Structures are given as C-alpha cells and as structure tokens.
Swiss-Prot record:
Its EC number is 6.3.4.21. One of its GO terms (cellular component) is cytosol. It comes from Nitrobacter hamburgensis (strain DSM 10229 / NCIMB 13809 / X14). Belongs to the NAPRTase family. Pfam families: NAPRTase (PF04095), NAPRTase_N (PF17767). One of its GO terms (molecular function) is nicotinate phosphoribosyltransferase activity. HAMAP family: NAPRTase. This is Nicotinate phosphoribosyltransferase. The keyword Transmembrane does not apply. Catalyzes the synthesis of beta-nicotinate D-ribonucleotide from nicotinate and 5-phospho-D-ribose 1-phosphate at the expense of ATP. Keywords: Ligase, Phosphoprotein, Pyridine nucleotide biosynthesis.
Amino acid sequence: MTVTDIATRTYNHGWRLDPIVRSLLDTDFYKLLMLQMIREFYPNEHVTFSVINRSRHVRLAEAIDEGELRAQLDHARSIRFSKNELIWLAGNTFYGKTQMFSPDFIDWLATFRLGEYELRKVDGQYELHFHGPWTHTTMWEIPALAILNELRSRQVTKGQGRFALDVLYARAKAKLWAKVERLRKLDDLWLSDFGTRRRHGFLWQRWCVEAAKEGLGPAFTGTSNVLLAMDNDLEAIGTNAHELPMVAAALADDDTALRRAPYRILDQWRHTYGGNLLVALPDAFGTQAFLRDAPEWVADWTGFRPDSLPPIAAGEEIIKWWKQKSRDPREKLLVFSDGMDVDSIEETYHHFAGRVRVSFGWGTNLTNDFVGCSPDGTVDLDPISIVCKVTSVNGRPAVKLSDNPEKATGEPSEIERYLRVFGSAGRVRAPVHV
C-alpha cells in the first residue's frame, strides 16, 4: 500500500506535480465492458456526450480556470494504455471469467486515444461537449467529470495553508473512518467503491479505497475504478449504464421500435456477457415501464441496479415483479448505488435482510464527503451533482426520463414524446444532491 501525505501533495498542486488523469484505466470498469460491446455492435454511430451541471448555483466557469481545464483535458488526450495495463486487462479474471476482453479488443485499445473536445463559457457555466464515434466519446465521461471535480477542489484548497490542509484531511479521514466502523457491524455486507466520477481527487479516492479495504475486509468487494483495482489487487466492479438504452432509443425509427429499444440492446449485452454481469438498469425511461414491457428472459437475469427511486421503494417494486414472474427474490440481486451513504446503506440492508441479496455501490459520499471538515467553515468543498450524458446520436436528440424528473435530460419536445411512449407511472420528483 502506498502511503501518501495528501495535505502536502495538495499544498504542492500549484507546482503541477499531479496530473488529474494518470492513466486511461483511471475510469469505471463498466466503460470498458460497454466499449467492447459498442465496438462490436455500434462501431459507426456518431454520439455526442455533454457535461451537465445540475447544481446550477455553483458557477463552474467562475470556480475553475479555463486555462487549467484545457491543460488537464489536453493531458488526458495525450495518454495511451501502457503495455503492462493491457497485459493485466488481457490476463486478469473478472467476475470469475478469464479473457473477459478479446485479443482483438486488446489490440485495438493499444492505439486508443481520447478524441477532441468542444469547450466554451456560457453564463457562468462551462459547455463541454465530446463529438465523434461512440467508441471514443464514451471514454470521455469519467475523466471529464473527474477533472472538473478535482479542479474545483484544488481551487478551494489552493489558498489554504499547510496547517489548515492538515486539519481538513484529518477531519475528512476521521469522518470516513467513523462510517467504516458503523458499516463493519453489518454481517455479510457487500459494498464497493463507485466514487470515481465525482471524487474530491485521485489521491483522496485512493486513500478512501485503501481505508475501506483495511476497515471492511471481505465486505469491501472491490472498486469501479480499474486503475485502483489493478494497483490494490481488488475486483473491478461494474455492469452497464444509461447510455446503452439512451443510444438505442435515439436510433429507433418509430414509436414501436422506441418501446423495444431498451430490450434490444440488453439482448446484445447478454450475448456479449453473462453470469453476474446480467444486472439491468431499469430506470432510463421509468422502472414501471421497463418492468411492464420486459421480455420473460429479463426475469432470469442476476438482478437489477435501481438508480433514481428511493432504494426501499425501488427494491420492493422489483421484488413484487419477480414474484409475479414466479422467480424467487432470495436468489436474485439488487445493487443500490444512487446517493448511498452510511444511513441509507444500514436502513436498506436491514429492510431487505433475508428477502433478497443486496450489494451497495458507495459513490460520492465515500470519495467526496468534506461537509463540515474545512477549518474556515467554507461549503465550497461540498459535492455537486454533475453528469456527462449522451445528448445526440447521429444528429438525433437523446433522452433520459429517469424515475426522478429532476434527473431527466433531453429536449422538452423529445421528453414529451418519450413520455407518450413509455408513460409517466411511478416517476417521483425529488431533490438531487449528488
């Protein structure tokens, strides 16, 4: 385990010792899983990803220097997969399977680089877009968000002295360790790190992962961050994301094809992967709509990752559906990852005990919880809700409805069309904090 004096390294950031993105493996594992499938089934689709700051009260273009942002984005474009990284991807076992990634895909990754970006300032915010083949724009999502979040953190800490930084990180470490001490009281807990995209910084995420591994032992099942999984001998965790049904839906030529789109791309997923990777994300166009129209084979999948309803309500809805399909929920898996923290993890764990297998993806509240830690009382280190979503496919607008209308993305006219096709049943508006 590498021991890093985070306060000193933070103090020295002004001397550019730390590029934010160090490796193309500094991404979520499901990006590589999806990339392999995208390359096979959708090699020619032109897809635009756009950064969306849902915390509009934070004016990112005023908080982050444009020159520093461009320098970090340009640095990310200069990175390639190293030979050792490709050997590890090719030879490692993921989810119990050897050669998860084909030799042809590994060879293709050897020449991969991130594409160009479009950046401008508009009314105190950055408009940041990535245009190009889906095989390349998809890989911008995680590094772009990590860069924005860490530059914001660096700007806040830049003016703090060495002693103040010591206090800041000491408090944040104590706060996290108190959470770990509570969580390790839960028998047979399954918990993993999902915190890359909105982390405080790379070094801090690394410390959080090491602390969770040390404090939780076998209950800490791994991390979504591929680089940290490789460096810490952990399982790389992840399945698939909203971008799959969003792109499939945008490609649909009529309403019938639109309604079938989420299942068509999941059918391609199940023919690419199997076993524990058969975990569906049901809420892109509403969970109730997804369950209502789902083919019978979806009920045979390992489980679901409910993402935008309160966890207990979402879990109960899926358990009810499994029972209607004559499937035993005790043999199924629910992965909860939407804004989870120690309180909601404990509550959800106890609620479903003995009724269904549950695991938790611990994200922003693991890797970016500095609330109340700053010696000067600033709230500028509080996490914000920032995403990078598909916004167009071959020139057509893309849409995400979500179970929470506050998380919906897309042009209003297209959102209305999708609501006509999928319906609005089960959607509940709630504040989005992370």
